[in-house]
Amino acid sequence: MYKVIMAPTEGSDSERVAISVAVKLAQRFDADLRLVRVETTPLVIETVARPPVLMITERTLLDEHLARLHKLEALGTECRALGAIRVDTALEKGPVAPTLRDYARKFDVDLIVMSSHARGGVKRMTLGSVTDYIIRHTNIPVLVVKPPVSFIGATPWETFGEILVPLDGSVLAEQILPEVAVLASHLNLPVKLLHVLTPVTYSQKEIMQPGLPWWDTDIATANAYLDRCASYLTEEGLTVSKEVVLSDNIATAILDCSARTGAYLIAIATRGNGGMSRLLFGSVADEITRNSPTSLLVFHPKRVAVTDETPVRSEAQVPVGT
């Protein structure tokens, strides 16, 4: 259950969809919504060597601060009217990413909802300094909202359609499943589990299609693995499908599956085995976030020592992969 949802804001129009999603999620979870804006304090320059028009005065800084505060409070009022929910606003000062992280920790935030757009463009808020920092330095799920244009104004369940969960066979990758279960159950979303098989042997590289002897064992193993992962979700009453695909490009396979199935939310833990361990912060993530309208639910699980024989249990104590 999400009890406190945080939505960072900088006052731009491009974040409106993310704010709308945060409001609707707060409604569904009966959660508190915290709208947080961070302002950096510029250096006050007082010198007679410059013309007055170029001087940054304390009055100017105060006026700008009050304008940001009023805009934030107006957004809070709008969110309360839209969702009849509990909304708190906070205008913090300091470096943006660390300040957001500290705020989330201080107020026991369960979910952070962020737009994929901000000043500085898409890259800054996806793989750039702010989102990248928050994901790396917290163990809080981050929902990066990047909905298809045709779904603007839709509800989250209409926007996301289905949750796509790429899994690589590692226990750490499975730590996203409890978060998926919570979100899917409250939004009535189906879940698709995906495992991408990459070629290892020469024969596999030469002919990448199922139904051939050199793929049979790997495909059977992958399906059995996804069945084990799916069992937890189905026990929670969720509708779950699974798919094993053959590809030498993990990102392309994930994006193709998302587009083909209408799964506009990709959920993943940031650590895993092989190629998937590079999904969020490597070339795979770049391709997903820059070339796809797909939103991301990203979870950075706490670092724990594991072996293949000792499955990790998340904070929700979910025995996945046993």
Task: Report residues per predicted region.
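Short phosphate-binding/catalytic loops that engage adenosine nucleotides
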Residues: 84-85, 140, 237-238
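Small/aliphatic-rich secondary-structure junction motif
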Residues: 1-55, 88, 158-211, 230-243, ...
